[in-house]
């Protein structure tokens, strides 16, 4: 006999129609309403804070044009097009740089229907679409677990407007994952309970292509989900069912591998992996506050991503740490937990709670990434939504006592506001350890107000036939109010720094057409992130996590921090000559600061389009030769502070490459490794400029250069090394040498040389046929089951 709250065949139970589109519409309308005030205030160009402003708007606008062929021209040497982005840091393969952000997102590809110039104004409509899609998917999943379809609508709204989703508007592309995941879980249920074929493979592929990084966590969660349901005998597992499920899993992975294989090969070169040096780091977090923050994140509305209300220690900011359900918190889920025994949902959520509290298990959702994140919470949130609506639908469940208990837990956090604190320097006493009291009061107020309204509705309307509808209305109203406040806190908290964002971005589009012609890099000074993307220029200041991995070794070797952004300080003047920076851009308001801080190598060029532009008098065109080299071992023995100066004088070769290519250069004498001053840097730039290529042309698949050499020599290009590059010298393929711990050089003969570097993502030759083959197999597989179903019906 079927137990209440377990899976069942989706039924309409005599109702006139399904409510999928109603759910989609409600979620879209609510999202549109809470974005509307900001949309109106800003004239349609919605900007938020942090990553949304610096990355998401810039990435969507830039990539819309890049895919359509705007910007750098096609290469005349090859038929390969649109594979390499010069505006991404020092230059990066576009597939690997953006597959984490948007390259596989169906929402991004949908945005290509619109002109590039529209994209900054379409960020809100696209977010509304994502919320709508999330609601539809959650409804499809949840309707299996309810008797009254209205509770599926309610559960879908709880999931769609959870604290996790609203929090991650800040990151934008995380909402894509929230939107698509319910369809994956729905398709798994369809395969397990209804023996429905092909849908699971399809949604595996879609979720994998959408975001390979989040897909790793989805695989872990699906394993937990499957095992927990199997352990409670929610479905009957046969060898045939398991075999078909395994086949569809592999088939979906094959169809989605178009981005996966290149991304994995790129990630293997990325140093942001788990630190295996600490056994305790596997099992415990280093700060007690981390545990408290995790527990509170499941019951209280979230803080703004970059502001913490309480916590002063631990990794809290930007981690997406929230599993809060709007209005209800965990009240309904706890009520369900108390009422059920041996239930699969309880086991799923319980297992996820253990994973959240153990570092090594938590990091399993991110391929053992060493950085702490909670960006997988959206998956148990969907199960929590199911538990909540099951508890609300069952009139025998005690709803009030869990709500009271959670209210008291929320109130207990007031202790952080009143605990006495003694100043270690002055000895004076004060009260409270709150970091942002105003935000804390707002979060606590919404949490308590939500539970108060939840209890009122349950007490007054629970026996009413329209209880689910009333609760849905209350949840949506609460979600609207909280989302406006949450986004407002984050947005206006940075208003003093971001109020001129739109002006700078739009002015950069004007400046793009007024900059001198040529293929060179630029630098910026005290202006907003990623302006280089609006200029379509390679820029030393870049904010993005997934640029070419070799950049993450090149910069640290120079003492320049490179985690999620590149921002070498202006004082590192030699880096500008090495990387062929010709112009530096700032605003008129910052000119005085720039001139006081900069070295003598910058001269004022012109002011236009709201910017002041300076020219680098030590500019060296890209593509030049050296007289000297030193080994990487010798290089690593030098002071990091002057290594950029050293790189203008000598090429750095690995010990192995020095044995092969050292004969074309002179080993740098020890005495010349120390004369590293500004004056000697100017002379080194002059010497490198004398050997520079006469032609250097950037294109959307790499670059073309022409150079005349007096003797056979290595020609250096300050382009990040990547296994996806193939070099051609005078039409003949040539070996690429990794130099300077992350850049490239190629050996050219004496005389005139035509050099072409062509980029295709490493692994694409494997992933492309794998994906195409997978699609062909899936179409045949689907066609077979459609044919069999029709034949059965006719029989």
Please place each PLM-identified region on the residue numbering.
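Active-site-proximal, structured, solvent-exposed surfaces of multi-pass membrane proteins
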Residues: 5, 10, 14-16, 665-795
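Periplasmic/ER-lumenal interhelical loops and adjacent helix-loop junctions
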Residues: 53-57, 61-76, 106, 241-242, ...
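Soluble catalytic regions of membrane-associated enzymes that act on cell-envelope
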Residues: 113, 471-713, 717-725, 730-735
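Active-site lumenal/periplasmic loops and adjacent helix-entry segments of GT-C-fold
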Residues: 37-145, 150-182, 206-210, 293, ...
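Contiguous transmembrane helix-bundle modules in multi-pass membrane proteins
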Residues: 194-195, 214, 345-506, 752-795
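Start-transfer (signal-anchor) and selected internal transmembrane alpha helices
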Residues: 1-40, 244, 452, 466-476, ...
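Membrane-embedded helix bundles of polyisoprenyl
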Residues: 27, 131-144, 150-231, 244-264, ...
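Membrane-interface helix-loop-helix junctions at transmembrane boundaries of multi-pass membrane enzymes
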Residues: 234-243, 333-356
């Amino acid at each position: 006999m079927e137990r209440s709250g377990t899976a069942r065949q989706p039924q309409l139970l005599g109702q006139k129609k399904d409510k999928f589109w109603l759910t989609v519409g409600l979620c879209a309308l609510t999202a549109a309403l809470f974005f509307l005030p900001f949309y109106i205030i800003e004239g349609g160009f919605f900007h938020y804070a942090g990553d949304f402003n610096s990355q998401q708007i810039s990435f969507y606008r830039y990539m819309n044009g890049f895919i359509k062929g705007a910007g750098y021209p096609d290469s005349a040497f090859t038929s390969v097009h649109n594979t390499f982005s010069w505006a991404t840091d020092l230059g990066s393969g576009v597939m690997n740089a953006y597959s984490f952000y948007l390259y596989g997102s169906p929402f991004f590809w949908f945005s290509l229907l619109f002109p590039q110039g529209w994209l900054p104004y379409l960020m809100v409509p696209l977010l509304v679409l994502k919320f709508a899609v999330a609601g539809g998917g959650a409804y499809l999943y949840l309707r299996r677990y309810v008797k009254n379809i209205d509770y599926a609508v309610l559960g879908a709204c709880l999931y769609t407007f959870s604290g996790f989703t609203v929090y991650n508007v800040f990151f934008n592309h995380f909402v894509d994952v929230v939107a698509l995941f319910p369809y994956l879980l729905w398709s798994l249920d369809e395969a397990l309970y209804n023996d429905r074929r092909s849908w699971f493979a399809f949604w595996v592929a879609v979720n994998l292509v959408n975001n390979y990084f989040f897909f790793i966590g989805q695989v872990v969660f699906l394993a937990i989900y499957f095992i927990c349901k199997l352990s409670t005998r929610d479905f009957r597992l046969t060898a045939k069912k398991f075999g078909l499920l395994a086949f569809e899993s592999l088939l979906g992975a094959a169809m989605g591998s178009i981005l996966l294989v290149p991304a994995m090969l790129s990630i293997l070169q990325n140093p942001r992996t788990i630190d295996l040096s600490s056994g305790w780091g596997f099992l415990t977090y280093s700060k007690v506050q981390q545990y408290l923050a995790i527990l509170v994140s499941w019951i209280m509305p979230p803080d703004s991503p970059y502001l913490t209300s309480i916590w002063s220690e631990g990794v809290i900011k930007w981690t997406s740490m929230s599993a809060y359900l709007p209005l209800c918190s965990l009240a309904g889920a706890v009520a369900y937990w108390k009422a059920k025994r041996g239930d699969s949902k309880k086991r799923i959520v319980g297992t996820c709670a253990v994973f959240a509290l153990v570092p090594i298990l938590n990091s399993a959702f991110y391929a053992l990434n060493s950085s702490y994140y909670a960006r997988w919470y959206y998956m148990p949130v969907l199960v929590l939504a199911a538990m909540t609506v099951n508890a609300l639908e069952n009139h025998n469940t005690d709803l009030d006592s869990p709500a009271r208990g959670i209210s008291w837990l929320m109130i207990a956090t007031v202790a952080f506001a009143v605990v006495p604190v003694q100043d270690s320097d002055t000895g004076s006493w004060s009260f409270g350890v709150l970091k942002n009291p105003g935000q804390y009061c707002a979060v606590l107020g919404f949490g308590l107000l939500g539970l108060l309204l939840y209890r009122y509705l349950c007490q007054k309307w629970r026996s009413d036939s329209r209880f689910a509808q009333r609760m849905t209305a209350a949840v949506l109203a609460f979600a609207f109010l909280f989302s406006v406040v949450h986004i407002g806190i984050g947005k206006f908290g940075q208003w003093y720094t971001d109020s001129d964002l739109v002006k700078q971005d739009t002015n950069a589009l004007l400046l793009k057409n007024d900059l001198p012609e040529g293929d060179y890099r630029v630098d910026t000074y005290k202006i907003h992130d990623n302006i280089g993307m609006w200029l379509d220029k390679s820029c030393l200041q870049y904010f993005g996590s997934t640029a070419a991995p070799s950049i993450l070794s090149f910069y640290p070797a120079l003492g320049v921090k490179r985690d999620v952004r590149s921002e070498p300080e202006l004082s590192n003047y030699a880096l500008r000559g090495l990387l062929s920076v010709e112009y530096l851009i700032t605003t008129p308001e910052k000119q005085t600061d720039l001139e006081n801080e900069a070295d003598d190598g910058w001269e004022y060029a012109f002011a236009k389009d709201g910017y002041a532009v300076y020219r680098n008098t030590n500019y060296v065109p890209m593509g030049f030769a050296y007289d000297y080299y030193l080994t990487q071992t010798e290089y690593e023995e030098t002071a990091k502070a002057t290594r950029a100066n050293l790189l203008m004088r000598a090429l750095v070769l690995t010990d192995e490459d020095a044995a092969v290519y050292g004969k074309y250069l002179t080993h740098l004498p020890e005495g010349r490794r120390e004369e590293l001053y500004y004056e000697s840097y100017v002379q080194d730039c002059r010497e490198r400029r004398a050997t520079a290529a006469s032609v250097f042309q950037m294109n959307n698949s790499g670059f073309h250069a022409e150079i005349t050499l007096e003797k056979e020599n290595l020609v250096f290009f300050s382009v990040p090394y990547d296994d996806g590059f193939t070099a051609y010298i005078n039409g003949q393929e040539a070996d690429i040498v990794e130099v300077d711990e992350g850049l490239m050089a190629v050996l050219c003969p004496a005389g005139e040389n035509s050099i072409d570097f062509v980029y295709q993502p490493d692994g694409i030759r494997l992933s492309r046929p794998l994906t195409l083959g997978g699609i062909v197999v899936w179409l045949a597989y689907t066609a077979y089951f459609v044919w069999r179903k029709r034949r059965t019906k006719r029989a």
